[in-house]
């Protein structure tokens, strides 16, 4: 870190929040191009091959060409076919600049975070922190008491100026913002909808897109969190003066005194405040869950539409917000389909000569495997067709049979481990059938034989990789220490492998 700070002279630029000179340092693009986008921006790279002096020639020439309209004129659609060399040169320029932008715009955030960590002598422990393994138990404990879910599709920025305005609150350097605005206006269409010539550009600029997207969504969340915490006064306050809280707490105290002092109206403040809302941001969606009534949830939907249109100048379509009742609809989260199921329970009670039969409905969260989207992912990866029929997958000729079987078995084990908390395993068995038969057809294709002949020759060796021990994988067994019965019980667990969670959560897009 000290080496990178010395190369880039960040202390001098940080004093005035001035990042524009960093665009002309060749080391920026060396670090950005060589560090890999999955690593931190402060990862040191010893094999850069440059000395401690910054070179201005390369980037000055490139920046100068960007401002020359003759080199970046609007070209017809068939220009890339007629002049492939100039087209690749143009995308090469934008790729270099995008890598540098992705590196530079993170500097203010990273320096602020590093200075915060250096100032902290002791890490404060918090009891409210939860790992990813507690997400689904949290849903089982809390969502069973909720009624409605707002499924919101996050807005995309309609114009690049919105992204620049959001970054203006963090980056005080006007020159850097002007250069970023120029770059986004010039290459926005090619970056969002790349063609074959620029397909590699969008993959390498993923970090820049993620940073801009999180900055865009963070502007909504910073306002929304405050509104959610102060939601008890939204019912009687006009949206034009929403943040005005004059006499608000005085009115609440007055209501409390009335309810507490009058014996007939003794109650809690809970009846005055509106129901609490659980908030989750997942991929491109917001999930708001509440135990309020349908009128309360509909009021939140109308308010959110007005809030985004007035405070963020964005036209928000009402059809992007879905009001779903948990007992009738599923909501997708972390690769699972969750649903609130009502389980009837009959309790018989006898008091002296009277017998009472009480019918109770117990709410329980059910989590299912999204079999349709999983089959679509398997079909995209050439394991089956769109109807779920297994097909042979082309493999390299140098792979041995054991390696092929191990690859198919590893995919099957990942699915069973990740979806171990599913309420029903029928969908998992169908996935195992598809992978097992696809593996057999792949091996038969390699040996130029039929599946039946190959299975007879191979025997039961092929099935061993797919026959998982459900006692070890799907359940854990714990002794009942507090019970008088010396027995054991089984409970559903959540085996969320953090290493593979991204691949399985995003199975709609990749396998």
Curated annotation (Swiss-Prot):
GO biological processes: mRNA processing; RNA splicing; tRNA processing
Cited Pfam families: Intron_maturas2, MatK_N
Keywords: mRNA processing, Plastid, RNA-binding, tRNA processing
Location relative to the cell: Plastid
Keyword Plastid: yes
MF-aspect GO terms: RNA binding
HAMAP family for the chain: MatK
Purpose of the protein: Usually encoded in the trnK tRNA gene intron. Probably assists in splicing its own and other chloroplast group II introns.
Annotated protein name in UniProt: Maturase K
Organism encoding this protein: Lathraea clandestina (Purple toothwort)
């Amino acid at each position: 870190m000290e080496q990178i700070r010395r190369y880039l002279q960040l202390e001098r630029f940080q004093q005035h929040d001035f990042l524009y000179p960093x665009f002309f340092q060749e080391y920026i693009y060396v670090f950005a191009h060589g560090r890999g986008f999955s690593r931190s921006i402060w990862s040191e790279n010893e094999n850069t091959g440059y000395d401690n002096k910054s070179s201005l020639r390369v980037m000055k020439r490139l920046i100068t060409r960007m401002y020359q309209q003759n080199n970046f004129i609007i070209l017809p659609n068939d220009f890339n076919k007629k002049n492939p060399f100039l087209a690749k040169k143009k995308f090469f320029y934008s790729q270099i600049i995008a890598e540098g932008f992705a590196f530079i715009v993170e500097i203010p955030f990273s320096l602020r975070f590093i200075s915060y960590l250096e100032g902290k002598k002791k890490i404060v422990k918090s009891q409210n922190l939860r790992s990813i393994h507690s997400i689904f138990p949290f849903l089982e404990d809390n969502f069973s008491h909720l009624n409605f879910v707002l499924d919101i599709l996050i807005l995309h920025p309609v114009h690049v100026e919105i992204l620049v305005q959001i970054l203006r609150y963090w980056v005080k350097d006007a020159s850097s913002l002007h250069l970023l605005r120029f770059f986004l206006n010039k290459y926005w269409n090619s970056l969002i909808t790349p063609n074959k010539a620029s397909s590699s550009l969008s993959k390498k600029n993923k970090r820049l897109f993620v940073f801009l997207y999180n900055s865009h969504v963070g502007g909504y969340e910073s306002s929304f969190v405050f509104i959610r915490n102060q939601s008890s006064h939204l019912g009687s306050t006009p949206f034009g003066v929403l943040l005005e809280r004059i006499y608000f707490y005085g009115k609440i105290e007055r209501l409390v005194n009335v309810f507490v002092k009058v014996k007939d109206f003794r109650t809690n403040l809970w009846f005055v405040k509106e129901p609490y809302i659980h908030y989750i941001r997942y991929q491109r969606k917001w999930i708001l869950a509440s135990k309020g009534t349908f009128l309360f949830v509909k009021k939140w939907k109308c308010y959110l539409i007005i809030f985004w249109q007035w405070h963020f100048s964005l036209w928000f379509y009402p059809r992007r917000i879905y009001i779903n009742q948990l007992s009738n609809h599923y909501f997708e989260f972390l690769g699972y389909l969750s649903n609130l199921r009502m389980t009837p329970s009959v309790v018989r009670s006898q008091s002296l000569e009277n017998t009472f039969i009480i019918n109770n409905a117990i709410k329980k969260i059910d989590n299912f495997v999204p079999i349709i989207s999983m089959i679509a992912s398997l079909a995209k990866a050439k394991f089956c067709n769109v109807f779920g029929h297994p097909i042979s997958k082309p493999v390299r000729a140098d792979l041995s049979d054991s390696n092929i079987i191990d690859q198919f078995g590893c995919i099957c084990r990942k699915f069973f481990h990740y979806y171990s908390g599913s309420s029903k395993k029928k969908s998992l068995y169908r996935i195992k059938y598809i992978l097992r038969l696809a593996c057999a057809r792949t091996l038969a294709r390699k040996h130029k034989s039929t599946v039946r002949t190959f299975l007879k020759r191979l025997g039961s060796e092929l099935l061993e990789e797919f026959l998982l021990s459900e006692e070890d994988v799907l359940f854990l067994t714990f002794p009942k220490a507090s019970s008088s019965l010396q027995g054991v019980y089984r409970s559903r667990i959540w085996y969320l492998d953090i290493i593979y969670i991204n691949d399985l959560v995003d199975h709609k897009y990749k396998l």
